[in-house]
């Protein structure tokens, strides 16, 4: 976390002015101790955030940027987020620990990326389907007891951060396949990329599951390391170029019907902020929650229509 302050301007003060200035500075310093993020001289605080997404044409990085912009606007420029793409400081899998240790002030990823540390992570993003939608999960998180369980899980994992959530994602497609799948037996032995709770379920169904970062999925399909893959949605998938390596895009699936972004914030950095700035970080997540969801509904549909030439409804007799 970086605090900046503007240099003092003007002439060298007289002795009388010096003592008056010193007294005023002492009072200001006392106030600054009470509210440490109010940088002296009208400056601002900058928090370093790394996302799990590449920069450029990537809708998830764009959404992380939307959140950062809202924080800047809500604070009147006194609180800024220095957003960095994946790999700028650490790997995707290292974001949680980097935020906890203070290497980063903030992160932008999903809880499925720390599922390997504790399967309970799936409850906050890739949990069992046929229940709550992603919007309902976020309601449970804030008003149904989910946050207490989330914070308990963070402590067990060893993550030392405060977390907020935004962007309730629509149910995700089953993904891209090199061959058309019409029955359950078609997926047996298939090398498939996914994350979270789905890794266990699909392994039990006979698939060979690979957990790969988003940027490695398309090259892995191209070289044959995997036969099929899911990432998230038509927009992000097309930005990775998945339509260039597969012509079969299966939509409805069970595996991720309730995911959302997690924004981890280093506890020390968070506690050093004023209550007003803490509230901005939280409420900007709520604002981005609505804005990003509206954006997704339009963008995902538009991008799906660009490469979907033929839609076939599955038969209820398929098994």
Task: Label every PLM stretch briefly.
Residues 2, 10-137, 149-313, 317-319:
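N-terminal secretory/targeting leader peptides
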């Amino acid at each position: 976390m970086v605090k900046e302050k503007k240099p003092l301007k003007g002439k060298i003060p007289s002795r009388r002015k010096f003592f008056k200035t010193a007294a005023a500075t002492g009072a200001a310093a006392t106030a600054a101790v009470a509210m440490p993020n109010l940088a002296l001289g009208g400056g601002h605080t900058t928090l370093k955030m790394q996302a799990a997404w590449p920069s450029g044409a990537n809708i998830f990085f764009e959404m992380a940027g939307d959140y950062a912009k809202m924080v800047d606007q809500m604070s009147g420029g006194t609180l800024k987020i220095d957003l960095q793409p994946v790999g700028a400081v650490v790997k995707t899998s290292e974001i949680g620990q980097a935020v906890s240790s203070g290497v980063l002030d903030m992160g932008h990823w999903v809880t499925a990326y720390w599922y390997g540390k504790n399967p309970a992570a799936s409850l906050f993003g890739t949990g069992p389907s046929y229940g709550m939608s992603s919007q309902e999960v976020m309601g449970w998180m804030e008003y149904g007891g989910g946050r207490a369980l989330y914070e308990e899980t963070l402590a067990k994992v060893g993550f030392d951060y405060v977390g907020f959530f935004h962007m309730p994602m629509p149910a995700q497609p089953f993904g891209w396949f090199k061959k058309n799948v019409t029955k359950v037996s078609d997926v047996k032995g298939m090398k498939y990329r996914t994350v979270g709770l789905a890794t266990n379920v699909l392994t039990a169904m006979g698939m060979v599951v690979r957990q790969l970062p988003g940027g490695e999925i398309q090259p892995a399909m191209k070289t044959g390391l995997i036969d099929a893959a899911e990432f998230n949605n038509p927009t992000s998938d097309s930005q990775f170029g998945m339509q260039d390596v597969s012509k079969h895009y299966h939509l409805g699936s069970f595996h991720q019907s309730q995911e959302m972004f997690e924004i981890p914030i280093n506890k020390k950095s968070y506690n050093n902020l004023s209550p007003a700035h803490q509230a901005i970080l939280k409420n900007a997540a709520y604002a981005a929650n609505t804005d990003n969801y509206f954006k997704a509904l339009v963008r995902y549909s538009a991008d799906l229509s660009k490469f979907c030439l033929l839609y076939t409804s599955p038969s209820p007799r398929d098994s």
